[in-house]
């Protein structure tokens, strides 16, 4: 099955739909601790929970993807020798400073893996790096799921 390539765009704020902007605001409330729960955050910005969950993993303020942040990639890898090593090789070649690697016990031949790394010295952009990882044989999914300012 062919993997669908994800594309990222830099879009001017006033062109974004209100639900996407409110999702960013709700995420910022949670990050700063101004809201303790998703329910509280979405109520404060007048956004439905379903809209929040629809957009939360796909929208980030621009500064959060710039150099000097940590990024967490969640991946599903086939349980075969060398696949994780190849993923780490791509990250090392891009000069990502790896902070943590977590791998769950494989179930039905698939293992969930998260890798968190700093982007300060990153050579290349995150889109190209994740694309190269997705293209590896044995990589089923790659999703940037977390990030924070260093």
From Swiss-Prot:
Residues 72-147 form the ACT domain. It comes from the Bacteria. Gene3D superfamilies: 3.30.70.260. HAMAP family: UPF0735. Belongs to the UPF0735 family. NCBIfam families: PRK04435.1 (NF003361). This is UPF0735 ACT domain-containing protein PTH_1602. It comes from Pelotomaculum thermopropionicum (strain DSM 13744 / JCM 10971 / SI).
């Amino acid at each position: 099955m062919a993997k669908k390539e994800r594309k990222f765009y830099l879009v001017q704020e006033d062109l974004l739909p209100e639900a996407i902007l409110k999702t960013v605001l709700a995420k910022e409330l949670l990050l700063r601790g101004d809201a303790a729960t998703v329910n509280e955050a979405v109520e404060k910005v007048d956004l439905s929970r379903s809209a929040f969950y629809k957009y939360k993993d796909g929208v980030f303020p621009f500064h959060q993807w710039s150099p000097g942040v940590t990024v967490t990639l969640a991946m599903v890898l086939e349980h075969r020798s060398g696949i994780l090593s190849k993923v780490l090789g791509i990250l090392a070649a891009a000069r990502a400073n790896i902070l943590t690697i977590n791998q769950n016990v494989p179930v039905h031949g698939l293992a969930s893996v998260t890798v968190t790394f700093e982007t300060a010295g990153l050579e290349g952009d995150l889109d190209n790096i994740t694309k190269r990882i997705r293209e590896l044989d044995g990589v089923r999914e790659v999703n940037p799921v977390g990030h924070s300012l260093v």
